[in-house]
């Protein structure tokens, strides 16, 4: 059996020589315990060798941390695990998003092991963290054992910090040192924080917001305590949002500037140029809306606008307040804010700049609804507070805390001249003078005392006994003046099952009990006794009575120590049995009792059991003499202390609560539910130690700090590395609460048979717990959980666990959050049972909205905003559906919609290509230009995605083949109809590129004539159609990737794409088909080929010659085509439901006939799914303990002028695997001239609606009147399209279209949808080519926001972060400068000449104004003075092809490293080639492969491009701002037979 051993090392590393191995030497050397380890096998005979035994330590950080020389003498001692078990272990990590599920698994891995300081921990070979601190008994130790009671806290050194600086009245006050409080914030506090981040290399992102509350009441009235100001408005000034640490010096400058102007901006209102009015006044911190600021910051975590940052963990809200930690709040706001924040994982901390007061903090004052005139004090459990600048002098010695600013600011000569009045202290009403207390005390000792105790007082005692702590009551409440006791009797009690009317208890005839023969100590005792019953029994009224003397005490231990009273193991005394004791009790007649409590406290007598008898008219309670003697001395001392005015012992709560008001009686559930969010206290200045411990421990965050931590001191550990929400908690409702305050739901989950080998029962149990931990649940532990489980009929408290072992059968796990309790159990048959308790919200409180005035980072004035309240997603999540999805059941994709807890979206944009152009093909003689390199890069990405795809189909190998991408230029509808017209057989729904039924009818011995016939057959062949691409038309051609797929599906001896490509090259050698320009061999991709004339049949699907020659004249928009023509395109193609559209479309159309037998058909729109989803295994090497999968959505139809989209969705996957996968994608994209940019899920307008702190840049568009100098036909175009100017400006600054608006997808006969849902963007969205900015055109404005996701992803080094931020701000300033000067806009638009006959070659399809064939502008691509290197923008006519075989792709593409080294360093740029239809991607900025600058010919002059190329039709002149070399070798002249077919591109 394993034991725990301790290594004791010499304090100074003493080394003993060989001849001094005697016992005397052992005594001279002092040892300290440094290292603990698990000794699995300890052999006794090893001790006989004494000093000959050697201990070896592996090299590494442990050896260096010990600092012990080799061959030093050590001692090894066996220790019990409990002796060396740590209380708290802190584990730190950085640069990764670590979910709480992964924290749970790391905690399970470390259980029953020993750790030491700076020990490195590797989890799943991808997550790396280290042990930062180990605490035992409140002190740091070097090493310890992690046992079942050890709390493990995870701290992140890369978090998101939200700093809210409260600018209240006190902010402008001077301190005693003469420094303004705000200057102390920005000169001391914030620099200290940022300096720690920089020294420890922490990578936090910080958001700084200035906040204040302003009262708009014109009458300046001094607000009293508890009085709220009228017409209060909250102002927020966003200084910076999610910036890096490297810019903290600029932040300090910005903060000082904003502080100087903040008061002026919020207090003044300009009505005219010469009239400015001062309005309102800034409120002090105690009157400010601090809850609104905290809730608004916490809402960012659960906002729909939140995007998962894979490099940062935890969100910490830090409120810097000039006050002392006291705030007046409204009850409704306190309740809702506490409820919401208690259900989140956000840490909230307040740093006060003033000195710590002498009372408990943070202190919230509120008026309850039932008593609106009475203030109550409470300490919230979800806020931590600290005070900056308090030295040991202030903590160890008393200094005045009272601050009267008017007196402090007086001069020496002003003391006698100024009339400063200070209100007298309010004399407490109802309090007695000290002399009266003395008289009452004397009367209690030397004379009979009359006290009448009502049943309400007794019921209050019962209520107080049910709680864990008892508040201190004033001494006056101990002496009730309601009546008198004329004589005392022995105690009696009765329990009544029916609640009788209310009555009081009167006791007479004082007689000493037999046990009271000794001298009397005190004559005053008023303890109450009550019946005890089980929770399952019916509610009964407690029996109450008074006792006669101190000696006749009821059988109840006043001390209620944990050793004597344990609520979970106590015995239950029923009211059915009666046992009389030796003392003869006097019978007291008592009237029926009114108050009724459902459950009496379960208290157990210490020595003997008092028994209760039932009687309708009297009660009997008896006590043994032993009990009376035992409690005599201790009780008399407590009573004397209470009468003399000294504080009572905090354990003796019964006597103090005897006369509590009956109105304060609550059920068992109300205080407990409230205490989960805050603790009410009666006297903040005189709080007991127990109450303070309850405040510190009764919180979800109570295990974050070690024992004996000073609560008020500045916690630099928290500011440097915020802690994640602890995994375990002891907060749990009682049985009565679960029965009355919660709704119940139960269901069973069984594992799918297909998942048994993949996941297993143990894995399913673990995943169900893990996903709840990720949603903010905590593992419930403690006595309450065991007690609740024991009350179940089939309860097994011993089966409750927090660590799921390999044998999960029979285990039970409880998880809890603010409003839910989940019980997950696994029976011995493998069935998972889930029981969910939803808290019933009985409080009638409306959800508050955020009605604020905010000024964002780039705004110039405050604007009024109304943000909706946030809600935790755990309430909305369908746990039943989600758990079944984890078990392998996903019917109709419904579970997939519910389980998308985390989403991430990236796009691919062309970038500068400076590396090798090796595509990895076998034929090294092929020459590829930059566009083809990017084409192949996209193919490799898709190939890598599908290489590790997960499929349940029988043919799993085919599922790993990437699907074909479809590219189009022009209108999307025209492209879809072209596919249908070219091959109507695709509408039959029997063809699918991925899972098509194999028809292996042929082999390689087929005759060429037969092969040509089969290829061109209407059914079963491939598509032959006239392809128009980049001003040219190629008749009767097919695409290489279609032919590869057809060969694999129809040839019995061809199974892979490589075999298909090799066979295709053999056919080319036999002159079966050729490349349309004889430039390439047969390749798998978007390359055009034509059959030889002897094998080609008549192109029946080709359009007439007159239509070919007039492409732009015949081009129609579906929005303008009549319904007859539109329906005619599909007439006769199909009259039944359509299930698939080719190999990439998902179509559905319903055809029906009218009842009057008419021939007219009613056709519903076709549904086209333009994207496809695939589930990918991110851990093919099986490093993780579970399957690591992610659902990836990718485009199937793509316009090269737009971004190529990838969307990642996962529920319970380790984020580090996703981050590594995206990093591999990024490296692959860089090799092939593509840039991976991470974008938010929501559009810009939606982000601004949900995130009040988001940076917003608004640019007003110039009007047509300001552009009056432009040619008439240009003005006519801009008048017809209101968004054309905005599009041209965005193109000018290098923006690329990201996603079209929802209205652009609403086509006449086609309904567009994605694999993740229907498009929901209200406006078209653009992204800057480097991913720094995102823009939308809303009305007559351009709205932009910084892309913080991409900025934070690329900001690895500080220099890089500064460069990216500067570049983004440079673009913003240039755009603002341009928009402020209409003549600059006019000059920019005037540089492009547009002839009326010119084709709109550069207009993006689907955008506003592109439906009618209206001429559109082609803009110049060079942006003045900003681009340092040739830049790229995707054009509308770019071809990108997929890849079937992946050589690295997302996994790193290690095979291409050798080829990448062959890059030509002399490449400066690449020309655009107009022949992309022959396998060359036209993306608008082609870097030159070879330097042939001097070989430019007139035939290729139209192909010259700048760094950002926009295709320009004939007759359009472009003023070049940058010399770009043209590569003549990239595009030879078209063949003579094709020159006559050159036409202008449609788009």
Swiss-Prot record:
Subcellular location: Vacuole membrane
Name of one Pfam family that matches: DEP
Topological category with respect to the lipid bilayer: Peripheral membrane protein
Start-end of Polar residues biased regions: 608-618
Gene Ontology MF term list: GTPase activator activity
Entry keyword Thylakoid: no
Cellular-component GO terms for this entry: GATOR1 complex; vacuolar membrane
Acidic residues: bias regions: 1451-1464, 1482-1494
UniProt cross-references to CDD domains, sorted A to Z: DEP_DEPDC5-like (cd04449)
Residues annotated as domain DEP: 1018-1093
Location of the region described as Disordered in the Swiss-Prot/TrEMBL record: 489-517, 597-632, 1393-1547
Compositionally biased residues, Basic and acidic residues: 1419-1450, 1495-1547
Chief place where the protein resides: membrane
Record's protein name: Vacuolar membrane-associated protein IML1
Organism for this UniProt entry: Yarrowia lipolytica (strain CLIB 122 / E 150) (Yeast)
Gene: IML1
């Amino acid at each position: 059996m394993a034991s725990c051993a301790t290594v004791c090392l010499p304090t100074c590393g003493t080394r003993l020589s060989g001849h001094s191995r005697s016992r005397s030497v052992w005594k001279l050397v002092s040892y300290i315990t440094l290292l603990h380890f698990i000794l699995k096998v300890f052999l006794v005979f090893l001790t006989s060798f004494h000093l000959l035994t050697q201990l070896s330590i592996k090299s590494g950080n442990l050896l260096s941390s010990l600092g012990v020389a080799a061959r030093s003498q050590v001692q090894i001692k066996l220790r019990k695990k409990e002796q060396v078990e740590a209380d708290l272990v802190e584990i730190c990590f950085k640069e990764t998003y670590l979910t709480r599920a992964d924290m749970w698994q790391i905690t399970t891995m470390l259980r029953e092991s020993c750790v030491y300081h700076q020990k490195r921990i590797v989890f799943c070979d991808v997550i790396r963290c280290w042990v930062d601190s180990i605490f035992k008994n409140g002190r740091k130790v070097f090493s310890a054992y992690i046992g079942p009671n050890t709390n493990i806290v995870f701290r992140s050194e890369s978090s998101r910090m939200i700093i809210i600086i409260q600018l209240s009245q006190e902010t402008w006050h001077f301190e005693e040192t003469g420094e303004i409080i705000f200057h102390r914030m920005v000169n001391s506090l914030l620099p200290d924080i940022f300096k720690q981040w920089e020294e420890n290399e922490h990578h936090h992102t910080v958001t700084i917001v200035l906040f204040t509350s302003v009262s708009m009441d014109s009458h300046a009235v001094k607000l009293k305590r508890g009085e709220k100001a009228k017409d209060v408005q909250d102002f927020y000034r966003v200084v910076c949002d999610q910036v890096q640490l490297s810019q903290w010096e600029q932040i300090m400058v910005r903060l000082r500037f904003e502080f100087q102007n903040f008061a002026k901006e919020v207090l003044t209102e300009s009505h005219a140029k010469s009239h400015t009015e001062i309005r309102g006044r800034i409120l002090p911190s105690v009157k400010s809306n601090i809850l609104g600021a905290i809730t608004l910051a916490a809402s960012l975590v659960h906002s729909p606008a939140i995007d998962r940052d894979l490099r940062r963990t935890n969100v910490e809200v830090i409120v810097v307040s000039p006050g002392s930690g006291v705030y007046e709040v409204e009850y409704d706001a306190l309740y809702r804010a506490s409820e919401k924040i208690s259900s989140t994982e956000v840490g909230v901390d307040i740093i006060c700049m003033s000195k710590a007061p002498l009372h408990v903090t943070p202190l919230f004052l509120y008026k309850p609804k039932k008593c609106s005139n009475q203030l109550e004090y409470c300490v919230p459990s979800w806020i931590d507070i600290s005070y900056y600048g308090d030295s040991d002098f202030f903590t160890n010695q008393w200094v005045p805390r009272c601050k009267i600013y008017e007196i402090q600011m007086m001069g020496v000569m002003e003391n006698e001249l100024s009339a400063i009045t200070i209100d007298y202290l309010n004399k407490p009403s109802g309090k007695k003078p000290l002399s009266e207390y003395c008289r009452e005390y004397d009367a209690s000792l030397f004379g009979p005392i009359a006290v009448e105790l009502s049943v309400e007082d007794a019921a209050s005692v019962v209520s107080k006994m049910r709680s864990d702590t008892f508040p201190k009551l004033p001494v006056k409440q101990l002496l009730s003046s309601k009546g008198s006791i004329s004589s005392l009797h022995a105690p009696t009690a009765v329990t009544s099952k029916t609640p009788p009317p209310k009555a009081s208890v009167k006791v007479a005839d004082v007689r000493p009990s037999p046990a009271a023969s000794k001298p009397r100590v005190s004559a005053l005792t008023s303890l109450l006794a009550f019946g005890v019953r089980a929770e399952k029994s019916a509610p009964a009224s407690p029996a109450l009575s008074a006792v006669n003397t101190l000696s006749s005490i009821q059988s109840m231990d006043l001390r209620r120590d944990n050793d004597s009273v344990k609520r979970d193991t106590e015995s239950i005394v029923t009211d059915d049995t009666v046992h009389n004791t030796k003392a003869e009790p006097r019978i007291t007649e008592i009237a029926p009792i009114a108050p009724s409590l459902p459950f009496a406290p379960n208290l157990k007598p210490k020595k003997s059991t008092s028994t209760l008898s039932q009687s309708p008219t009297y009660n009997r309670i008896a006590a043994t003499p032993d009990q009376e003697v035992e409690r005599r001395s201790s009780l008399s001392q407590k009573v004397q202390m209470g009468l003399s005015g000294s504080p009572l012992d905090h354990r003796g709560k019964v006597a103090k609560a005897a006369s509590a008001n009956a109105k304060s009686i609550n059920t068992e559930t109300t205080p407990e539910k409230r205490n989960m969010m805050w603790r009410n206290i009666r006297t903040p200045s005189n709080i007991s130690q127990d109450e303070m411990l309850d405040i510190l421990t009764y919180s979800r965050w109570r295990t974050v700090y070690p024992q004996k931590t000073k609560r008020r001191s500045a916690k630099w550990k928290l500011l440097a590395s915020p802690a994640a929400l602890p995994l375990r908690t002891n907060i749990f409702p009682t049985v009565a609460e679960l029965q009355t305050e919660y709704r119940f739901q139960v269901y069973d989950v069984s594992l799918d048979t297909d998942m048994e080998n993949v996941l297993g029962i143990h894995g399913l149990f673990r995943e169900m717990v893990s996903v709840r931990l990720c949603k903010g649940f905590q593992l419930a532990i403690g006595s309450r959980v065991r007690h609740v489980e024991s009350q179940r009929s089939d309860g097994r408290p011993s089966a409750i666990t927090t660590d799921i072992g390999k044998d999960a059968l029979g285990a039970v796990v409880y998880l809890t959050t603010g409003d839910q309790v989940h019980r997950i159990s696994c029976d011995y048959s493998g069935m998972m049972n889930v029981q969910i308790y939803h808290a019933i919200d009985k409080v009638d409180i409306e959800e508050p909205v955020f009605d604020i005035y905010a000024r964002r980072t780039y705004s110039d004035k405050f604007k009024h905003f109304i943000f909706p309240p946030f809600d935790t997603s755990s309430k909305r999540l369908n746990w039943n559906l989600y758990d079944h999805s984890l078990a392998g059941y996903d019917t109709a994709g419904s579970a997939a919609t519910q389980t998308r807890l985390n989403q991430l979206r990236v796009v691919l944009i062309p970038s500068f290509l400076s590396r090798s152009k090796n595509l990895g093909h076998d034929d090294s003689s092929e020459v590829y230009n930059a566009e083809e390199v990017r084409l192949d890069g996209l193919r490799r990405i898709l190939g890598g995605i599908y290489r590790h795809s997960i499929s349940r189909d029988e043919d799993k190998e085919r599922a790993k083949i990437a699907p074909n991408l479809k590219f189009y230029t022009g209108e999307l509808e025209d492209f879809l109809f072209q596919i249908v017209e070219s091959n109507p057989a695709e509408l039959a729904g029997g063809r699918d590129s991925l899972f098509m039924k194999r028809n292996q009818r042929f082999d390689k011995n087929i005759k060429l004539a037969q092969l040509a016939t089969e290829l061109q057959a209407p059914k079963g062949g491939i598509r032959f159609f006239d392809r128009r691409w980049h001003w040219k038309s190629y008749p009767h051609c097919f695409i290489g990737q279609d032919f590869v797929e057809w060969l694999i599906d129809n040839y019995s001896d061809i199974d892979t794409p490589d075999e298909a490509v090799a066979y295709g090259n053999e056919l080319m050698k036999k002159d079966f088909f050729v490349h349309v320009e004889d430039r390439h061999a047969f390749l798998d991709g978007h390359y055009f080929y034509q059959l030889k004339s002897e094998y080609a049949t008549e192109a029946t699907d080709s359009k007439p010659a007159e239509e070919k020659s007039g492409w732009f004249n015949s081009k129609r928009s579906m929005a303008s085509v009549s319904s007859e023509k539109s329906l005619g395109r599909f007439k006769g193609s199909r009259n039944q439901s359509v299930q698939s559209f080719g190999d990439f479309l998902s179509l559905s159309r319903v055809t029906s006939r009218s009842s009057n037998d008419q021939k007219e058909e009613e056709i519903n729109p076709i549904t086209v799914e333009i994207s496809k989803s695939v589930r990918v295994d991110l851990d093919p090497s099986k490093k993780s303990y579970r399957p690591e999968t992610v659902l990836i959505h990718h485009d199937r139809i793509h316009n090269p002028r737009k971004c190529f989209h990838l969307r990642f969705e996962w529920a319970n996957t380790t984020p580090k695997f996703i981050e590594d996968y995206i990093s591999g994608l990024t490296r692959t994209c860089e090799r092939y001239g593509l840039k991976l940019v991470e974008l938010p899920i929501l559009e810009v307008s939606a982000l601004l609606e949900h995130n009040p702190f988001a940076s917003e840049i608004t640019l007003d568009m110039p009007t047509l009147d300001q552009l009056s100098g432009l040619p008439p036909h240009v003005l006519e175009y801009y008048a017809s399209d209101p968004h054309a100017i905005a599009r041209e400006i965005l193109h000018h600054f290098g923006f690329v279209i990201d996603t079209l608006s929802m209205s652009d997808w609403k086509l006449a006969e086609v309904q567009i949808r994605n694999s993740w849902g229907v498009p929901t963007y209200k406006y078209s969205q653009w992204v800057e080519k480097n991913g720094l900015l995102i823009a939308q055109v809303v009305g007559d404005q351009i709205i932009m926001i910084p892309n913080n996701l991409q900025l934070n992803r690329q900001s690895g080094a500080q220099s890089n972060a500064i460069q990216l931020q500067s570049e983004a701000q440079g673009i913003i300033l240039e755009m603002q400068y341009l928009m402020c000067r209409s003549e600059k806009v006019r000059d920019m638009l005037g540089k492009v000449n547009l002839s009326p006959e010119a084709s709109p070659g550069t207009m993006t399809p689907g955008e506003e104004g592109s439906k009618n064939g209206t001429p559109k502008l082609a803009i110049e691509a060079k942006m003045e003075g900003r681009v340092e290197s040739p830049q790229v923008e995707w054009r509308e006519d770019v071809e990108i092809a997929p890849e079937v075989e992946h050589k690295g792709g997302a996994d790193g593409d290690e095979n291409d490293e050798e080829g990448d080294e062959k890059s030509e360093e002399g490449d400066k740029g690449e020309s655009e080639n107009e022949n992309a239809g022959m396998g060359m991607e036209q993306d608008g900025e082609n870097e030159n492969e070879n330097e042939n600058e001097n070989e430019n010919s007139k035939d290729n002059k139209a192909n010259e491009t700048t760094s950002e190329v926009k295709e320009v039709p004939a007759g359009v002149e472009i003023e070049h701002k940058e010399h770009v070399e043209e590569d003549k070798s990239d595009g030879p002249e078209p063949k003579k037979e094709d020159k006559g077919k050159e036409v202008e591109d449609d788009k």
